Amino acid sequence: MWNQFKTDEYQGMLAETVTMPGNQGDLIHAYLSRPLGKGLFPGIVLIPHAPGWDEFYRETSRRFSQHGYIAISPDIYCRFGHGAPEEMAAKARAAGGVPDDSVVGDCEGAMKYLRSMPFSNGKVGVIGTCSGGRHSFLAACRVEGINAAVDCWGGRVVALKQELTPAQPVAAIDYTEKLACPLLGLFGNDDRFPSPEQVNRHEEELKKYGKDYKFYRYDGAGHGFWYYHTEAYRPKQAMDAWNKVFEFFGEHLRS
């Protein structure tokens, strides 16, 4: 994954905030980054996590672009207002969460936005961490045309009936039969949200329907082990997971 470039080759990147059509045609903000130079590039939709549409997702978008992907992260919280990322995420939680239908619609809009670019190769993947991991799986099941999906420790994929809400009226696992693209799952064995037992249950459902998936579980890692700005960060496990993400997207979006 690292240092896969020649020291004399051109490298450049454009990163900016754009406006794109989201769910039901709503105009929403999104953070877009893309490589400059020759070539047609695959696209990736990054779905924000529970802490908000934050700096981590901007940095992660640029990391993907450094490796040759057009990356876009839609502001799924924008309908709750504008301000500091954590404030908007808190507003969403207080209101019962961002409705699944809204997030799925925003992801579909982001996918179409990427495909409309003249430098797109036409293939688009989706990835998210935490609640964004759950939404990544949902989008892969409900949005036609996604080519690959990564679920990073998405909680509430497995949910009891009493845990469902007006914003999340259907357990994500109940859409498994409709999954129409390869899925990569990354989980920490010390996590409780999702717990190893919930990951097992999700895997059982994927096997039941004969889906194309790979799950990796990391000992000594809990929720958010990618987050280098938190105490949850586990460098060894995080770097292995990053390598698996780039291998997975490389296989399904570049060929």
Could you say what each language-model-derived stretch is?
Residues 1-255:
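N-terminal cap/leader regions of alpha/beta-hydrolase-fold enzymes
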